[in-house]
Amino acid sequence: MCIRDSITTLWKGNLQLNPAMLFSIGLVSTFITGGLTGIILGDSTLDINVHDTYFVVAHFHLVMGISALYGLFAGVYHWFPKMFGRMMNKNLGYIHFWVTAVCAYGVFFPMHFIGMAGLPRRYYTNTAFPYFDDLADINVLITVFALVAGAAQIVFLYNFIHSMFYGKETVQNPWRSNTLEW
């Protein structure tokens, strides 16, 4: 219901795909992914196979972690002009969004597969059992995506701090919004 309402709010709207809107759409995307993977976890016959595996880790962190971050970033990009009277750098915002979005799915999408392969969570090493040796390369890929995602957050911090002092001064209503906040 929530997803349908979010999508129909955008329907026939005059969308401006600025970083705030991209993060908002990304939030809806992660909720859709979470809803689809949640069906598997909600079905007891399927949940037996993926219970306490990386599938659960991927589902939970994609839905709860990434969605929360997307909401936070959307809010910061949208309300920054109101808070500081300056605009954040839009190009750095686009870089921040696309690198974060690709890396978020690059981290958590493969986790679904290694979870379906049976890799349990809470193991200090995946090479404790010979069966899991084939999954080590996927974990290396996940680690690389996670490190790149961390670097994207450094871009955000730079954009935030630099724009606070040196960003382009904004007009009274930078988003041309008709709501009372602006």
Language-model features, listed with the residues they occupy:
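Structural signature of transmembrane alpha-helix termini at the membrane-water interface
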Residues: 8-11, 36-43, 80-83, 106-117, ...
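Short, small-residue-biased leader/transition segments that mark boundaries at the very start
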Residues: 1-3
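Interfacial and helix-entry/exit segments of alpha-helical transmembrane bundles
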Residues: 8-38, 54-57, 62-71, 75-109, ...
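Repeat-solenoid scaffold signature
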Residues: 134-166
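Membrane-interface interhelical loops and short amphipathic "cap" helices
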Residues: 39-60, 113-138
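Generic, ordered loop/turn and secondary-structure boundary motif
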Residues: 16, 47-51, 56, 176, ...
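Juxtamembrane/interface motifs at transmembrane-helix termini
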Residues: 42-43, 86-87, 178
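Extramembrane terminal tails and long inter-domain/linker segments of multi-pass membrane proteins
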Residues: 117-134, 161-182
